[in-house]
Amino acid sequence: MKQALVDYITSDGITHGLDFHTEAKGAFLEAFDRIILQPREMDYRLQFTGPTGANAVEAALKLARKVTGRDRIVAFTNGFHGVTLGALACTGNGYHRKGASRPLDGVD
């Protein structure tokens, strides 16, 4: 197992994808299903969650921009989604938004 981990890391595989699918997560899910769930006839679903809601907002921003090809995001007043640059940009509340030294481009 240690060698498999070293091989994956040295092949420049994604090691931390937060909310996104990676080869490592896919391989883990296949192995977990084969080794743990199927032998016990368990029909479970697994979910990888990010550490915070702000991480989910950041992932959603990236995914929305990638899928649509657009770069504009709409922000609503009084929405608060965390203190990362992207999450702060997604609130229309000036008090929270000014906490970031530089606003994220493309958020109105």
Predicted regions and their residues:
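Glycine-rich phosphate-binding segment of PLP-dependent enzymes
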Residues: 1-23, 27-48
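PLP-dependent aspartate aminotransferase-fold enzymes
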Residues: 29-108
